[in-house]
Swiss-Prot record:
Stated name of the protein: Pathogenicity cluster 5 protein d
Residue ranges, annotated region (Disordered): 35-89, 299-400
InterPro entries: Appressorial_penetr-assoc
Keyword line: Glycoprotein, Secreted, Signal, Virulence
Underlying gene: CLU5d
Extent of Polar residues compositional bias: 65-89
Observed effect of gene inactivation: Leads to virulence defects.
Origin: domain of life: Eukaryota
Residue ranges, compositional bias (Gly residues): 316-326
Location relative to the cell: Secreted
Matching PANTHER family: G-PROTEIN COUPLED RECEPTORS FAMILY 1 PROFILE DOMAIN-CONTAINING PROTEIN, VWFA DOMAIN-CONTAINING PROTEIN
Glycan-modified residues: N328, N332
Naturally occurring in which organism (per UniProt): Colletotrichum graminicola (strain M1.001 / M2 / FGSC 10212) (Maize anthracnose fungus)
Length: 478
């Protein structure tokens, strides 16, 4: 019995000794490892796989486990394709690129302006019969709106279950695109408006960091695809592009099943405060009567005043000098006449914004944009042209300011002298015919910066503070 106890004690000491040197490169440690693994890999595999499965299967029945289910491996990612000349080889990976973001800054549900890597899968793709399609109904292409007057951007979207809008500050791109029981993408639509400067046909692409209006439509509209976003306070006079950006719930652009298709989004170009009204081929008098093609030609209709010396003086009248006198401002007739790039159309301009050439040839303006200037009224055969002067957005009170006390230190850009007598005011390289429009633009830029900072979580408070500051900014810069 004593001998048995002694043997057992010696065996125990041997086990302790072996355990103390398992990390040393020795025959003893190798033998112990082999004995523990029963051939090398079984225990490791069991431990690794079982532990991963046991630990991670507790969440949603295994949907969030850290190992890739072999059934989900896509062989399409394992080959580079057969590119034609000039095409590129695809990147390849044996495991769906699950570790593509290793060592990089992760997106992690945040809007990281310096760039990041997002490892979340793309998600469910709709069928070809369920592809998203959008049309912007208002503002219409080539439309002209009144300056500084509220309007609605109106859309019709097909095959999107709208109204699903997650927290953009903590769940940005953090979940896959999903579809509903009908096969339509679940998500929402963003609307963005950008200033195009002095032309509706610029030669350079617009800066995506610059926009005058942005809205994520987080409601379902009428449930039939009709959505809208309200542009409170309207826009100052200028040339603009409005576009949609259809998104899944977590704000990623919607993904479609085929490459060759129509676009899922839409854009329209329009003007605000342009020289259109009821002139040209239509309106009050059309192409007949009243000695000069046209009723209310030139700056006719309910069009804006003066434009700081840029009045049209009757547009490009080919009708023999009769009837198209509209808006002829005796006090400020030193402008260039804005002949719309030489495009003549029966004695009237084509409805574009002052100082802009070749805008939608053949289009007549629809609006009655009001701009600062000397109010004038001129009665003429075929109708009257009313030039009303407004100052827009004067407001009182509010928080912050244009420069001093600006919320978050986000200041409005300066209103400067452009050196162009026809458009003497400038803001960030864009020129304006009057100071009120320039001030409005500067304060809108500050407002957008304030909105962006609050939406990104860089500032505390609410976007209502940004709206309140807009009024103060306008007062101070005016």
């Amino acid at each position: 019995m004593q001998i048995q106890n002694l043997i057992a004690a010696l065996a125990g000491m041997a086990v302790v000794a072996e355990a103390s040197v398992t990390f040393l490169d020795s025959p003893l440690s190798a033998a112990l490892a082999k004995r523990q693994n029963k051939g090398g890999n079984n225990n490791n595999n069991n431990n690794n796989n079982n532990n991963n499965n046991n630990n991670n299967n507790k969440n949603n029945g295994g949907n969030n486990q850290l190992c890739l289910n072999p059934n989900n491996v896509q062989k399409g990612s394992q080959q580079a394709g057969t590119p034609k000349q000039g095409q590129a080889n695809s990147a390849v990976d044996q495991a769906n690129f699950i570790n593509f973001c290793t060592g990089q800054q992760l997106t992690n549900g945040e809007q990281k302006t310096a760039g990041s890597c997002n490892g979340v899968v793309m998600g469910k793709i709709p069928s070809q019969n369920n592809m998203v399609s959008t049309i912007i109904k208002n503002p219409p292409p080539g439309g002209n709106l009144q300056a500084n007057q509220q309007f609605n951007v109106q859309l019709k979207v097909n095959n999107l279950q709208a109204g699903s809008f997650t927290d953009a500050q903590s769940t940005y791109y953090s979940a896959p695109q999903d579809t509903n029981g009908a096969g339509n993408i679940i998500g929402h639509v963003h609307v963005t408006i950008q200033d195009m400067g002095n032309s509706l046909t610029p030669q350079n692409a617009l800066d995506p960091k610059q926009f005058v209006f942005f809205k994520g439509i987080d409601d379902a509209g009428d449930g039939k695809g009709n959505l809208q976003a309200t542009v409170t306070g309207g826009l100052p006079a200028g040339n603009y592009r409005v576009c949609t950006m259809s998104s899944a719930s977590n704000h990623q652009p919607v993904l479609m099943p085929v490459a060759q298709r129509g676009a899922q989004d839409d854009c329209n170009k329009f003007t605000v405060g342009g020289n259109g009204g009821n002139g040209g081929n239509g309106g009050n008098g059309g192409n007949g009567g009243n000695g000069g093609n046209g009723g209310n030609g030139g700056n006719g209709g309910k069009n804006a005043a003066v434009n700081s010396g840029n009045a049209d003086n009757g547009g490009n009248n080919d009708g023999g000098g009769g009837g198209n006198d509209g808006g002829n401002n005796s006090a400020n007739n030193s402008g260039s006449g804005n002949k719309q790039g030489g495009k003549q159309q029966n004695g009237a301009s084509t409805g574009g914004f002052p100082g802009t050439s070749n805008q939608f040839p053949g289009k007549t303006g629809t609006g009655s944009g009001a701009q600062t200037g000397n109010a004038n009224t001129k009665t003429q055969a075929g109708g009257s042209a009313s030039n009303s002067a407004t100052n827009g957005n004067s407001g009182t009170g509010g928080k912050g300011g244009a420069t001093a006390n600006a919320i978050g230190g986000i200041q409005a850009p300066a209103v400067t002298n452009s050196g162009d007598s026809s458009r003497p005011f400038a803001v960030n390289g864009n020129t304006f015919v009057n100071k009120a429009a320039a001030v409005q633009r500067a304060c809108d830029i500050q407002r957008n910066g304030c909105f962006d900072a609050i939406n990104r979580g860089k500032l505390t408070g609410s976007t209502a503070d940004c709206d309140a500051q807009l009024q103060t900014c306008t007062q101070q810069l005016s």
